[in-house]
């Protein structure tokens, strides 16, 4: 993470933390060990540990926030901002247009951030697949392409289950949909791909 280490911008907080970078790449080995029982119980324990870690880490960047339950939204938005800074881009909260309030606007794109923990169960992440339809008007409203940034468990699910990011699950049929979205100014982006480009 050479570019991160050499960047002196004090607004880059989360991405300087080794555990954050590990988490983004799906390495949760920094979590404390648990007494193993079975997969269901173990995942419940890991979910608690992951949430405790996430709230603590997010609090480092935003000590003003009360993070009783949900931490992934703010965490993801701040990762997005820090990535913009590392790429030399300016960012801001975009103006609300019609009923849209995207997460971030950079020099060259509107950014919507989708973050999920690695131990979230169920189908909550499947909402990510509806983003191109939900936000179809954003590229024309803002005159910029929409990039849907997927990070953490969301990136893993998109790559390994849903196939809307590059990987074995991205079939030719799914690729055709992704090409259509891109032709209409909407693209899914894996945060780890951005991080790798910054090495």
Kindly give the residue locations of the regions a language model identified.
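Residue-level marker for well-ordered alpha-helical positions
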Residues: 74, 78, 132, 172-175
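Conserved catalytic cores of phosphodiester-cleaving nucleases, focusing on short active-site segments
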Residues: 104-117
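Acidic-basic catalytic patches of nuclease active cores, encompassing PD-(D/E)XK
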Residues: 1-93
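Catalytic cores of nucleic-acid endonucleases
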Residues: 115-169
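Domain-level recognition of nuclease-like catalytic cores that cleave nucleotide substrates
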Residues: 147-199
